[in-house]
Regions:
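A glycine-rich, basic-preceded beta-loop-alpha segment at the flavin cofactor/substrate interface
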Residues: 217, 257-272, 277, 287-325, ...
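Alpha-helix capping/hinge segments and adjacent helical runs
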Residues: 23-26, 203, 280, 395, ...
């Protein structure tokens, strides 16, 4: 079916081509095979004890399962979750039933614990494989997928910092999908300024605490999708240090548990209201009061909470979850950009309009709009953004596997440092440029893209959250330039630049087009090093950080150019010809590899040059924004 006029069903993914499966417009399995098996060599991880029970076949089975669940249970209600968002009814959240039905199916697959230890009910899959599998769910319905992914972050934090009893009590039910999780940081008066959090936690004789305060912007903070919600809450124990050093982390369940783990009384956590959002509408976003006295455990006000680890270590513990969440944000942004690209590509191949410039005969049939150069430009830009972003997300997944399982402790430390350095980039670059891909997907659809008859406008609205939550674009920029680039004497930045330079050296030796692109990338690496030195040589942090967002964007573009050069080298290895050649596997493989080459060319010719103007402004220590005054606006 070709949706050239609005009609019922044109908003569904099936509308793009009745002969294609829903999953064909979520993510590209061919691209995932290339990234996992031809570039990142994921099967080699099965040589390590943690992953010894797995094989490429089990990896493919997991991808098949995730793709099927996404297509059959998540995608069908994506539009309904957007148009019929959750509401508060009698103090309880009501939402469309398809959300819980889909999450029950997902819980039954065991995928929520895909990369967790078998001892807590997990599958012990490599993180790079689980990241690829989860991409299907995020592409199909990012708001429904948010509930288990928030839960996954909670569970991983407690595995890292919780006691054995806390793991048994709370993590196992989360892995089983019976309990879900939320992360409660922000407060109405504090926003992103965690130093200004005022929620207090009063110690009790039994070792627990009673929490009093208000939390804002809490995704998944209340719903009826699971038996219980495990809130992880930052709060202050009276008498602690001021600022972020005085924050402690607490487990605050929505429903208290008995000694045997059975559900008991309601905790003193109250839903005040829901925030109504531009996108991500199927995910509840809540204002919660802790200790209001509506529910009175043991006859007293105060939300019962259990300290995680030691007092005043809450921020460090929460950043364990935050770093994971930030990479997850980048993964979600990538998935939304990717599905938008595939849908606009399918539309462009089917939508007839216009004729070639050389043929003005009105009796000649119109051509599909994919034949027009400007449409190809928009599609190629999207391809370069989303496939570059997916490579970056999966590369980070591979680094996490190295950090956890590399035989050499030095390799583990190196992977940890490199992942730490890449985290703000992996969060921010896909959030900015896969959103730009969604914008182009709308443009490819023309006027129809601006209507709700097609999915692409919703993808843009959903994706617009990603530059904001889990640390805004500006906060990531300050983190990269103000902390990551200078920590340990610049060790993280040095490692990143050395790693990129190693790829440049390999490409030089490969000769041909790879060597040509390597020269460009090598020059860009030198700009990063020189610009960073110049900024901090001023001795003025305010001046050095005034244009931190430009630094983040420039370094991000260089990193994604690196991802494209890595992919080009993998294509060369697969085809056996640095200058391009036929590949085993027939015409489909040949077209795939040719598309990779062309996308790499596009990124180096159209995108990497963008960094020059940014580096020039940074090198010039431009004060335009710093010197601007409030009264001049």
């Amino acid at each position: 079916m070709t949706c050239v006029t609005p009609s019922p069903g044109c908003g569904s993914v099936e509308a793009y081509d009745g002969r294609r499966s829903v999953s064909s417009t979520l993510l590209s399995r061919r691209d995932l095979r290339f990234l996992l098996y031809e570039w990142l060599d994921a099967p080699r991880l099965t040589e390590r004890p943690r992953y010894a029970e797995h094989s490429r076949e089990t990896f493919d089975d997991v991808l098949d399962l995730a793709e099927r669940v996404a297509a059959e249970h998540f995608a069908p209600h994506n539009r309904a979750a957007d148009t019929s968002e959750p509401v508060v009814d009698g103090g309880r959240v009501r939402m469309i039933p398809q959300v819980k039905a889909a999450l029950d199916v997902f819980a039954g697959t065991g995928l929520l614990g895909a990369s967790m230890d078998e001892s807590v009910g997990g599958m012990q899959l490599p993180h790079v494989v689980s990241a690829a599998a989860f991409g299907f769910l995020q592409a199909a319905n990012v708001s429904t997928a948010a509930y288990p992914f928030l839960t996954l972050g909670n569970a991983n934090l407690l595995l890292a910092h919780g006691s054995a009893a806390q793991v048994d009590t709370f993590v196992r039910p989360m892995v089983e999908g019976r309990f879900f999780g939320s992360m409660c940081l922000s407060e109405p008066q504090a926003g992103s300024s965690l130093a200004d959090i005022t929620t207090r936690a009063e110690p009790q004789d039994d070792g627990s605490h009673r929490l009093f305060g208000t939390k804002m912007w809490i995704s998944g903070g209340d719903h009826e999708l699971a038996e219980n919600i495990v809130h992880l809450v930052l709060a202050r124990i009276p008498g602690g240090p001021p600022g972020v050093k005085g924050l402690s982390l607490f487990i605050v369940p929505k429903v208290l548990l008995g000694p045997d783990g059975t559900l008991g009384a309601r905790n003193d956590v109250v839903l005040v209201g829901l925030n109504h959002k531009m996108g991500y509408r199927g995910t509840t976003n809540t204002l919660l009061n802790f200790g209001e006295g509506v529910h009175r455990p043991d006859g007293r006000p105060g939300a019962v909470g259990y300290l995680v680890g030691e007092p005043h270590q809450g921020l460090a513990q929460m950043f364990h979850m935050m770093n994971e969440a930030r990479i997850g944000v980048g993964a979600g942004a990538t998935a939304l950009g990717y599905t938008g690209y595939l849908k606009s590509l399918a539309y462009a191949r089917q939508r007839p309009q216009g004729r070639p410039l050389a043929d003005k005969d009105p009796t000649v049939p119109q051509v599909p709009i994919v034949a027009h150069p400007d449409v190809r430009r928009m599609l190629l830009a999207q391809k370069s953004y989303v496939e570059g972003a997916l490579a970056l997300v999966l590369y980070c997944g591979r680094l996490l596997d190295e950090e956890k399982t590399a035989p050499d402790p030095a390799d583990r430390a190196r992977a940890h440092l490199l992942l730490d350095m890449l985290t703000p980039i992996t969060k921010s670059w896909p959030s900015q440029w896969c959103l730009a891909a969604n914008d182009l997907a709308i443009q490819v659809h023309g006027g129809y893209g601006y209507t709700r008859d097609y999915d692409v406008e919703q993808h843009w609205r959903d994706n617009r959250l990603n530059p904001i939550h889990e640390g805004t674009h500006g906060i990531q920029a300050l983190d990269l330039l103000g902390r990551k680039a200078t920590m340990d004497g610049g060790a993280g930045l040095s490692l990143l630049l050395e790693t990129i330079s190693a790829t440049v050296s390999r490409a030089w030796k490969a000769d041909g087009e790879a060597a040509e692109l390597a020269a460009q990338l090598g020059a860009a690496v030198d700009r990063i090093a020189g610009t960073t030195r110049r900024l901090w040589a001023t001795g003025d942090p305010a001046l050095a950080l005034a244009n931190a967002s430009l630094y983040l964007e420039a370094v991000g573009h260089v990193v994604v150019a690196w991802m494209w050069l890595e992919q080009l080298l993998a294509v060369d290895a697969a085809t056996g010809a640095a200058a391009g050649g036929a590949a085993a596997g027939g015409d489909a493989d040949a077209a795939f590899y040719a598309g990779k080459r062309q996308a790499a060319r596009y990124f180096f010719r159209f995108e990497l040059p963008r960094t020059t103007a940014r580096f020039d402004l940074l090198d010039g220590l431009d004060r335009t924004t710093l010197d601007m005054r409030d009264e001049w606006f």
